[in-house]
């Protein structure tokens, strides 16, 4: 069993948890992920590793409570235990040799962009970190991101914090200003990553994206995480999750990502009905 050592609310529906998982922490690297189950009857969900501490034997995860399983996870408290916490899975991000990098995070993707930027910064690279959010109320890890980069650019859709702009606008301006990046790393909603790739394509800048796809087993057997990269079928869990963004077929990936929306809504509704029934019974 994997104990929750720390639980922190980052915004209205985003939680941070530090999990006791020494075997995972020992080998974890930025870009990798874990698969967890809240209970023996629960579904398996993949979450990218947000941070890790080898000495303490802990792994940090950050998640939004958007589905039945993440809601169940968010309802747990410090001292509670998870049934499964498997990892690290996937290939670690290839960051060696990069001297100047733009890291672009969108929304919850900033939780994954942060360890990438942190590792690069620790390696001595110059890092421009561009973080985009809908509004000031959902900004996460601002102080942590400031300490993990050379320059932090926060943008919001409504201008309530930082500049009112899209992450692609800031990225293009930085490139046009003469910044010669060895690579751009983009992590966030697929539509955002798609347009980051379209922004960098004319400049020929290597652009890496982290593909958060449907996933069940994390070993490539289920085929749920398949996507098309350079005209070939790849599996995010074993071939990724990092890929050359200029080769990814984002349109097909987004269609696959929406396949189970109806089932996800039904699961949330069932959970809400169960919770309401339980409240009535205990009164």
Model-derived regions, located:
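Ferredoxin-reductase
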Residues: 1-80
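Structural signal for conserved beta-strand scaffold positions within catalytic alpha/beta enzyme cores
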Residues: 6, 51, 154-156, 209, ...
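A generic structural signal for residues embedded in beta-strands
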Residues: 36, 84-85, 227
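Short, Lys/Arg- and Gly-enriched loop/turn segments at beta-strand edges
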Residues: 42-51, 89-99, 237
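FNR/FR-type flavoprotein reductase catalytic core
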Residues: 71-216
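Local cysteine-cluster metal-coordination motifs and their immediate loop/turn environment
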Residues: 112, 190-191, 212-242, 273-277
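Short Fe-S-cluster ligation motifs
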Residues: 235-239, 243-283
């Amino acid at each position: 069993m994997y104990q929750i050592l720390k639980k922190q609310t980052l915004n209205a529906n985003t939680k941070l948890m530090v999990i006791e998982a020494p075997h995972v922490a020992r080998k974890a690297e930025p870009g990798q992920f874990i698969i967890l189950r809240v209970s023996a009857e629960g579904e398996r969900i993949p979450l990218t590793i947000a941070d890790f501490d080898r000495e303490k034997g802990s792994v940090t995860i950050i998640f939004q409570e958007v589905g039945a399983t993440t809601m169940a996870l968010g309802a747990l408290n410090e001292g509670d235990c998870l049934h499964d916490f498997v990892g690290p899975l996937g290939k670690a991000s290839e960051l060696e040799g990069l001297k100047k990098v733009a890291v672009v995070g969108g929304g919850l993707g900033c939780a994954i962009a942060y360890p990438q930027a942190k590792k690069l910064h620790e390696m001595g690279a110059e890092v421009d970190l561009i973080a985009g959010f809908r509004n000031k109320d959902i900004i996460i890890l601002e102080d942590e991101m400031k300490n993990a980069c050379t320059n932090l650019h926060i943008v919001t859709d409504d201008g309530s914090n930082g500049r009112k702009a899209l992450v692609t606008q800031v990225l293009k301006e930085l490139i046009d200003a003469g910044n010669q990046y060895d690579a751009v790393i983009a992590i966030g909603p697929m539509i955002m990553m798609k347009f980051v790739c379209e922004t960098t394509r004319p400049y020929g800048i290597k652009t890496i994206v982290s593909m958060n796809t449907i996933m069940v087993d994390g070993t490539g057997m289920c085929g749920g995480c398949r996507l098309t990269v350079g005209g070939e079928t790849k599996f995010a869990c074993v071939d990724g999750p990092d890929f050359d963004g200029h080769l990814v077929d984002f349109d097909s990936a987004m269609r696959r990502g929406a396949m189970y929306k109806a089932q996800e809504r039904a699961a949330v509704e069932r959970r809400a009905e169960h919770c309401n029934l339980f409240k009535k019974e205990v009164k």
